[in-house]
Amino acid sequence: MTVIATNTVRPHLGKAKLQLNNMLEVTKAFGDMGITARVSRVLFGQNAGCLVFSTFAANFTEAMADVQKVFSSEMWSKVQMRLDDNPASDIVMPLNLVRVAAGEMKPTHRVMNFRWYLMKKDKMPMAMEMFEEVKGMCEKVDVNPVLLTPVTGDDLSLIHI
């Protein structure tokens, strides 16, 4: 199971390059600490143009160890000071955790299209069965479906495919 932490920001007008460079700098620092981190751009929908910072961990134990590593680092203190002194973006979606419930993230499939569904928790077994059917259809056209469920956030009834 992969645990993903995400944070989505909207760059201030004229500061998109600065924000992207700041995020790439943090991504490198996380990599130096042994943490897998990525920056992506939202292309469609209400958050088009936003940047997403994501980290990936194999399980919750690793994810929490990574959080502890980051928050106790000197690098993170510098990032916080930079955010206070020269903000280059506004937070659109604060830091949240999701987990992979079915499928797997693959580096060969770098473009993602999220569909969000509101689902009662007691319907999750049915969704898992349907996911296997969707996965079979997607394999025919080289699409890699992944089912994500929220761990934190506003609405824990959402699933992401």
Regions found by a protein language model. Name each.
Residues 1, 47, 107-109:
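Solvent-exposed loop and beta-edge segments used for protein-protein assembly and interaction
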Residues 89-124:
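Surface-exposed beta-loop interaction hotspot
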Residues 8-12, 57-58, 120, 151-152:
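Short, flexible beta-strand-to-coil junctions
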Residues 159-161:
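Conserved small/polar residues in nucleotide/adenosyl-binding loops
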Residues 2-10, 52-54, 111-117:
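Active-site-flanking beta-strand signature of metal-NTP-handling nucleotidyl enzymes
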Residues 17-39, 44-47, 56-93, 129-147, ...:
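An amphipathic, aromatic/His-enriched active-site/gating alpha helix that lines ligand/cofactor pockets
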Residues 10-20, 118-128:
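Short, surface-exposed ligand-recognition loops at beta-strand->loop->(often short) alpha-helix junctions
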Residues 47-51, 154-157:
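A short, glycine/Asx- and small/polar-enriched loop/turn
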